[in-house]
Amino acid sequence: KRRAEVAKVLSQIPVARALGAGCMGSETTNMAKQPGVTRKEAQEALLRSLGEILPACEEQGVLFAVECVYYHAMNTPEAVRMVLDTMASPNLRVICDFANYVGPEAASVDAQRRIWDKVGSWYGDKITAIHFKGQNFQPDGTLYSTSLEDSCVDYAGGFEMLRQMPQASLPVLREEAVPARAASDLAFMRRFAY
């Protein structure tokens, strides 16, 4: 299955180049889809996949961005830094989805500020795009989607970190959008985006 997914990515690199997209991106694999696999093993598989993908990206002049998700193989700022350091590719970048860094144990603003500090100081200059969505947690820790206003995500702290990065601008992509909420989403997002 991993080889098939790598083959899909490899087949799309020339397409990205032809379109002038310049960057492709992917989350890493959800641990629930890898029963019996440890996080270390999942990260090793990710590194093997990137070892096949990144040389093709470098050859074609296309960036490839990975996205941290707290319940995936690459699940923490430490894991992102390990991947970036291990691969050491000039074409490897990061998609920053603030919500995906926040698990139930890190939902407090203080915990999130510690995450944003790590992201900014360790690899903030590698961020190539921002994903923006709302989420929160049930008392038992179950994740659920919310409006942006009802989210537990510390957007203020996240965007404060981004404003200190060297990028002149970053695309901000609204995920899980509800068309009827477009106007309120846009107003909410404009409070933070730069």
Give the label of every model feature segment.
Residues 1-94:
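Active-site acidic/histidine proton-transfer and metal-coordination neighborhood
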Residues 22, 77-194:
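Histidine-acidic metal/acid-base catalytic patches
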